[in-house]
């Protein structure tokens, strides 16, 4: 065990660090999963609370997060390059189904991902239109926007961004790329281009919110199948947990928040706890021969 490496300082400030970890009710010898390693803030703190017999499995689909995780030199720790929806397969591989004392998820995009312009998550910084959390697979936002129809894009913007001007924005994006094909000009390929196009398409501006906020969120959620990933994990999480195991989730936007609250509410109501049997005290007496 190397506690110095386990709880090293980081420029990234972990959101709700103590609140989320406290929700796990850590046992010093427990087995835990950090399903969204990110830059390791939660994982390092969990490790600092575990004994030499504790264990932490971290999961992330971002290659940069995996690189950060490899900096942790601790025999109690291991990293899995995968999305958290694959936690059941990871548990099965490690023979840990039904043995996990706690699972932690910090949903959505991380601040380091937003800060890195080349990742394409932020409309505040110019970068390539990528938006993939795992840059090794799947379509980038640029590639998807080249082929999407107005109808499908409108649905995505409404469903995942709750954008009231979805049709206007979708039409502007698809028409721009169609024009590029016709005129031999460049497709939408930069975050700044997309943000400006959305701003022009939106008839009314919110003083407190950038016009592209909801659209960027919607496209990112779709590209990364974020809500599908969450639903898949929620459907299997309880089977992974040991008796008295904990599930601690940080959610930010209303869509994932509703999913988590609905899950928690239903499971609390529907959970069937084993019946407790009470028996009379057995009296013993000493028999002398």
Swiss-Prot record:
GO molecular function terms attached to this record: rRNA (cytosine-N4-)-methyltransferase activity
Pfam families: Methyltransf_5
Keyword Transcription: no
Catalytic reaction annotation: cytidine(1402) in 16S rRNA + S-adenosyl-L-methionine = N(4)-methylcytidine(1402) in 16S rRNA + S-adenosyl-L-homocysteine + H(+)
Disulfide bridge positions per record: none
Top-level taxon: Bacteria
Cellular component GO terms held in the UniProt record: cytoplasm
Stored NCBIfam families: 16S rRNA (cytosine(1402)-N(4))-methyltransferase RsmH (TIGR00006)
Purpose: Specifically methylates the N4 position of cytidine in position 1402 (C1402) of 16S rRNA.
Protein family: Belongs to the methyltransferase superfamily. RsmH family.
Record-given protein name: Ribosomal RNA small subunit methyltransferase H
Native source species: Haemophilus influenzae (strain PittGG)
